């Protein structure tokens, strides 16, 4: 089990260039860092949760990290390889709003049926609250995960069928930047959109 070569092969670099918003140099640097932190070339859910916990030291990020991990792990093998990592990172950090919303939708759609049910939304919102509620003051109409979920559904579920389609999700988020803030649980990032 020798040390993996941290230089990306030309065909891999070509694939990542086509599927991310990163430059060749950035891709090489990210790969070096990824292999330094994950010498096996794969990140497990437990390793991912430890990393995520560093970003949210005042809350419990483990449940939310599991949802993010599941969304990064596009082939469903229980690990994140460099390709999965860098493509998800590209979408979440440099993607256009619509790409970010599609990615968020796939995270919220826990069973992968193409809709977000109220219970799926509540599960994610509860995970977010566990992660940040100790450091974020919520408005009264969002003071509990249930209230926040109700507010999101009131604004997004335009056909009142009790579930959100991708179209409703994207349309709702685009028409009201506060929904993006609700989904991200990061008031400062709403101004980026």
UniProtKB/Swiss-Prot annotation:
Residue sites binding Ca(2+) 2 per the record: 109, 111, 113, 115, 120
Domain EF-hand, first and last residues per copy: 41-58, 60-95, 96-131, 144-179
Q: Which chain positions have N-myristoyl glycine-type lipid attachment?
A: 2
Quick check: keyword Membrane in the entry? yes
Q: Tell me which residues bind Ca(2+) 3.
A: 157, 159, 161, 163, 168
Q: Which subcellular locations apply to this protein? A: Membrane
Q: Extra notes?
A: Probably binds two or three calcium ions.
How does the protein's chain sit in the membrane according to the entry? Lipid-anchor
Q: What does this protein do?
A: May be involved in the calcium-dependent regulation of rhodopsin phosphorylation.
- UniProtKB keywords: Calcium, Lipoprotein, Membrane, Metal-binding, Myristate, Repeat
Q: Which family does it belong to?
A: Belongs to the recoverin family.
Annotated GO MF terms: calcium ion binding
Gene name? HPCAL1
Q: Does Lipoprotein count among this protein's keywords?
A: yes
Protein name as catalogued:
Hippocalcin-like protein 1
Q: Which Pfam families match?
A: EF-hand_7
What's in the GO CC field?
Answer: membrane
Protein origin, superkingdom: Eukaryota
For binding Ca(2+) 1, which residues are annotated in this chain's numbering? 73, 75, 77, 79, 84
């Amino acid at each position: 089990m020798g040390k993996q070569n941290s230089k990306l092969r030309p065909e891999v670099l070509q694939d990542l260039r086509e599927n991310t918003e990163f430059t060749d140099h950035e891709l090489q640097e990210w790969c070096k860092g990824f292999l330094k932190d994950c010498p096996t070339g794969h990140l497990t859910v437990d390793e991912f949760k430890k990393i995520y916990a560093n970003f949210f030291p005042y809350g419990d990020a483990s449940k939310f990290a599991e949802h993010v991990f599941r969304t990064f792990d596009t082939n469903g093998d229980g690990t994140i390889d460099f390709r999965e990592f860098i493509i998800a990172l590209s979408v979440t950090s440099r993607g256009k709003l619509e790409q970010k919303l599609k990615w968020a939708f796939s995270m919220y759609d826990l069973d992968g049926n193409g809709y977000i049910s109220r219970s799926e939304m509540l599960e994610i919102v509860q995970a977010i609250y566990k992660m940040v509620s100790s450091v974020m003051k919520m408005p009264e109409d969002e003071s509990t995960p249930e209230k926040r979920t109700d507010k999101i559904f009131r604004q997004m579920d335009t056909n009142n069928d009790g579930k959100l389609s991708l179209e409703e999700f994207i349309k709702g988020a685009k028409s009201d930047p506060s929904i993006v803030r609700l989904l991200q649980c990061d008031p400062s990032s709403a101004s980026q959109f």
